Regions:
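A short beta-strand motif that forms part of the nucleic acid-binding face
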Residues: 122, 357, 365-368, 528-530
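Conserved mixed alpha/beta core segments that line enzyme active sites in large multi-domain catalysts
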Residues: 1-6, 302-364, 478, 483-517, ...
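Short acidic, glycine-rich loop/turn motifs
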Residues: 20, 97-98, 130, 354-357, ...
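N-terminal non-catalytic structural scaffold regions of very large proteins
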Residues: 1-323, 368-483, 521
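A short macromolecule-binding patch
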Residues: 531-536
């Protein structure tokens, strides 16, 4: 997650955070002097160390290993003909020595005076780095007290454990415990996928701990942000938010229950003599700890609700509801306007209309008509593929992140029988903005105007002529409608009614087409011609 904050003096400070599903948070932030510091504890902000120190500890121990990832180390041929322009932005990679006397310090700009001294000493070449693009990391390298892996590990340990004697072995064990132990640190498959996608690195999806390459790539991206390159993360964008399904929430509860069971088993094993005959797993393992947690999850969880079955629509809508509340989520009292507001990335994924009117407004939403959730928990919406200005019948589902780079035409743009656009200029979306473009630039097209809204909002006739506030009330009040004594179809419908009733599974569906021949409170008989077979 890449962010920026504004200091009291008005300076913009860029930062990034790596937030695992389980384990220690890691934050890197620039200070007002353009030095990048690592924070491993959000509460104790004083315990910080330079980003270069942390990189040395993560597997870039030597100066060359570290610097070569950020700057180009080159050999400079020394001559008296050099001028200030040719030396601009060049810095010695190492201290230049004359015996025990330092001629030029590393990472200090080269001057004509230094070049003359080197010519007098008879030195032909010198290793330099080119800092023309930026000098941001050079500042950290100058101030870094550590120059190898061991000193970096000791410096980190000294900051994190002030009272303990700093040794490289202790520091290595501490870092392993914090970031490299799968039992205590887990990015999950989603975390690994997002890191690979954002930083454009290719690390195996099964690698669920942090690796040195992750931190190095994140640091490079942060330096790019400082120079005006790259994009900051929008916390309300659906590319940064995912749906945690029931299975995932239950798995987390089971992990807690199994941890308690493990502790109880270990306690019993210390009390019993291991050599006693007749020791069985049944005597050691008490499943009550696990079953109590699972029962508590389904019985008392904030998200465990009694299903609304006033009518078929109420049931269907309740099953398709998304909540930002609950354990690990937001608090309705502290949630601000931004998190409740409609975002451009909600298009085709979260309905902008259907939401409660009370304090939960914007925190509880409904999925759009054609939206689905992918394996990582991100909401996808379908689009028709456009090839060479022709709309095809191929459907592709895209997440909010994936559709960022594409031009997407609206579903109501007129097309001919072969799929070609009839208008010379068509309305399309690009990064949430509506623009008029040439059909040749379009990549995808919406599948239907209905994909923008949820099932409840899609059941409102002439929705486009409705005021948004009235549509919100209408979509909520449809769920409160009770059945008629004599069922009757409405004069005006939208075509979604049958699909909503059928998919809610609250109506009886015949296995084959036919006409009702007989019915009672207990059975319904359908036959091809609507006549009961005559028994012999």
């Amino acid at each position: 997650c890449f962010e920026k904050s504004v200091h009291l003096n008005g300076k913009i400070l860029h930062s990034f955070r790596i937030i695992p599903d389980r384990g220690s948070w890691l934050e890197v932030q620039f200070d007002t002097n353009d030095l990048a510091y690592v924070y491993l504890d959000r509460r104790r902000r004083r315990r910080k160390f330079l980003v270069t120190t942390f990189l040395r500890a993560l597997g870039y121990p030597t100066e060359r290993d570290l610097v070569s990832n950020f700057y180009n180390i080159q050999k400079l041929k020394i001559s008296e003909k050099m001028n200030e322009e040719s030396l601009a932005s060049l810095m010695p990679f190492e201290d230049i020595m004359d015996g025990e006397v330092v001629v030029a310090r590393s990472y200090e700009p080269l001057s004509i005076g230094v070049i003359r001294q080197l010519v007098a000493l008879g030195q032909k070449t010198v290793e330099v780095i080119d800092s023309s693009e930026d000098e941001i990391l050079v500042k950290s390298l100058k101030k870094d007290p550590a120059h190898d892996e061991e000193s970096a590990l000791k410096d980190i340990y000294r900051k994190l454990r002030p009272g303990d004697p700093p040794t490289a072995a202790n520091a290595r064990a501490l870092l392993k415990r914090l970031f490299f132990d799968p039992k205590k640190y887990d990015l999950t498959r989603v975390g690994r996928y997002k890191i690979n996608q954002k930083l454009k690195i290719d690390i195996d999806s099964n690698e669920r701990i942090m690796v040195g390459e992750d931190f190095l790539a994140a640091t490079k991206y942060l330096l790019g942000l400082k120079k005006g390159e790259g994009i900051l993360d929008d916390i309300d964008h659906l590319g940064s938010r995912r749906v945690r399904a029931v299975g995932e929430l239950l798995a987390n509860q089971c992990r807690v229950g199994l941890a308690r069971t493990e502790r109880l088993v270990k306690e019993r094993m210390t009390l019993f003599d291991v050599n006693i005959e007749g020791m069985t797993p049944q005597k050691l393992i008490n499943p009550k700890a696990l079953s109590a947690v699972v029962r508590d999850f389904f019985g008392r969880s904030q998200l465990s609700q009694f299903m609304d079955q006033t009518n078929p629509l109420a049931e269907l809508t309740h099953k398709r509801r998304l909540s930002a509340l609950g354990p690990g989520g937001l608090n309705r009292d502290r949630a601000g306007f931004e998190v409740r507001d409609v975002h451009t990335s909600h298009y085709g994924r979260i309905c902008p209309i259907e939401t409660p009117e009370g304090p939960n407004i914007g925190l509880i939403n409904s999925m759009c008509t054609y939206a689905r959730i992918n394996e990582f928990g991100f909401i996808e919406t379908p689009y028709r593929v456009v090839k060479k200005s022709k709309v095809t019948n191929t459907i592709e589902y895209l997440t909010a992140d994936q559709e960022e780079g594409y031009l997407i035409a609206q579903a109501n743009n007129p097309i001919d029988k072969k799929g070609g656009f009839l208008n010379e200029r068509i309305t399309a979306r690009e990064r949430g903005e509506f623009i008029e473009v040439d059909p040749s630039r379009v990549d995808y097209m919406d599948v239907s105007p209905k994909q923008l809204v949820s099932v409840a909002a899609g059941l409102i006739p002439f929705l486009e002529h409705d005021d948004a506030n009235r549509a919100l009330m209408g979509s909520n009040m449809q769920r409160q409608g009770v059945p008629l004594l004599r069922s009757d179809s409405p004069y005006i419908g939208t075509g979604l009614e049958e699909k909503a009733a059928r998919d809610s599974r609250s109506v009886i569906v015949s296995e084959a087409d036919g006409i009702v021949a007989a019915s009672s409170a207990e059975y319904i008989i359908t036959t091809k011609d609507g006549k009961l077979p005559v028994s012999e």
